[in-house]
Amino acid sequence: MGPPPGIGVYCRGGCGAARLLAWCFLLALSPHAPGSRGAEAVWTAYLNVSWRVPHTGVNRTVWELSEEGVYGQDSPLEPVSGVLVPPDGPGALNACNPHTNFTVPTVWGSTVQVSWLALIQRGGGCTFADKIHLASERGASGAVIFNFPGTRNEVIPMSHPGAGDIVAIMIGNLKGTKILQSIQRGIQVTMVIEVGKKHGPWVNHYSIFFVSVSFFIITAATVGYFIFYSARRLRNARAQSRKQRQLKADAKKAIGKLQLRTLKQGDKEIGPDGDSCAVCIELYKPNDLVRILTCNHIFHKTCVDPWLLEHRTCPMCKCDILKALGIEVDVEDGSVSLQVPVSNEASNTASPHEEDSRSETASSGYASVQGADEPPLEEHAQSANENLQLVNHEANSVAVDVVPHVDNPTFEEDETPDQEAAVREIKS
């Protein structure tokens, strides 16, 4: 026997149960295995074939035992024996013509037919059931169907519903052709068919077990990953929520430290060239309560406080009020803390680049809103002298000009001539 395209086992000569077992394994996994019983199990058939060879007046019998047949899916599972008889005529091997006849030998010395088995070739345009039904009508005890030419010893499980009255098996083409040629040479061939082994259910049970275990493993892995992913997202969300709450608390603390001022009639912010709040884009009016940030920008208190609570930065220059006020902030996921101390001198000595950027974007300045709260000019001069002495001491070979800090360069033109003279004196 041998495998049909995609199914089966190729056998040569006395190939037996091992290859049939492999064929049954492929059959059990094949989606093309029809029939209720065939879908559950495949039964092999033991074949005991004998040739009675006349030789010099003495008959000699040659026996050949092998497991090379497969019971049809609708065939009775029982033993049967008889002389193999092909259909009459060279073109009738397929037994598709309902008028096909079989020449059955008789018992020696009588007209009683011997028990016989129909040897029929697969194909011809009719079904397995038609072939088996015809053999049963002609009186055969069983039907032996061999495969197409060119398929060697390949076999398939036959499905023949409605033709389950007699035993029906399939054998390979090479085996069937060999028997047919022997019969055509006048050799009487007898076959004894015995029920072989049942194959398939253990394969199905194993397949079900394997699929069940695989499904359980995949499901468990999927559920485990989903739980891990969900727990990780929940943990990150909680950490982010805690961080946001902490930052809001720090922002409230920082907002409480920022300076408030009530604008009065005559302040520069209210004059003809007065500024407007960068948040609400409205001009300042007398009695407006404004918040002065660490970067010297001012805004309406009601406008900037909600912004600072959420963003903690100046709406204009993005100056971080938490760092500017030295309030402890969390870095990344809260595992590291950073304390940024800021003194009055550090907050009042920004780099020239920062001063330039602020002067370009600021519409209001800390120096312009402090009014009567500005420190005396002498304090500015003294602070500038100290900075100049410190730089000259640290860099002896490098000439450094230190420009005294002005809170908002935008309003430098408002300085008095005395202040300009003091600055020139400091530079000299």
Swiss-Prot record:
Catalysed transformations (reactions): S-ubiquitinyl-[E2 ubiquitin-conjugating enzyme]-L-cysteine + [acceptor protein]-L-lysine = [E2 ubiquitin-conjugating enzyme]-L-cysteine + N(6)-ubiquitinyl-[acceptor protein]-L-lysine
Membrane topology: Single-pass membrane protein
Recorded GO CC terms: cytoskeleton; endoplasmic reticulum; Golgi apparatus; late endosome; membrane; perinuclear region of cytoplasm
An MF annotation (GO) of this entry: ubiquitin protein ligase activity
ZnF (RING-type) intervals: 277-318
Residues of the signal peptide: 1-38
GO biological process annotation, one example: negative regulation of cytokine production
Stretches with biased composition (Polar residues): 342-351
SUPFAM superfamilies: PA domain, RING/U-box
Reported modifications of this chain: Auto-ubiquitinated. Controls the development of T-cell clonal anergy by ubiquitination.
First-listed, main subcellular location of the protein, grouped into a coarse class: cytoplasm
PANTHER family assigned to the protein according to its UniProt record, in alphabetical order: RING ZINC FINGER
Function: E3 ubiquitin-protein ligase that catalyzes 'Lys-27', 'Lys-48'- or 'Lys-63'-linked polyubiquitin chains formation and plays a role in different biological processes such as modulation of immune response, cytoskeletal dynamics or protein homeostasis. Inhibits IL2 and IL4 transcription, thereby playing an important role in the induction of the anergic phenotype, a long-term stable state of T-lymphocyte unresponsiveness to antigenic stimulation associated with the blockade of interleukin production.
Designated name of the protein: E3 ubiquitin-protein ligase RNF128
Species this chain originates from: Mus musculus (Mouse)
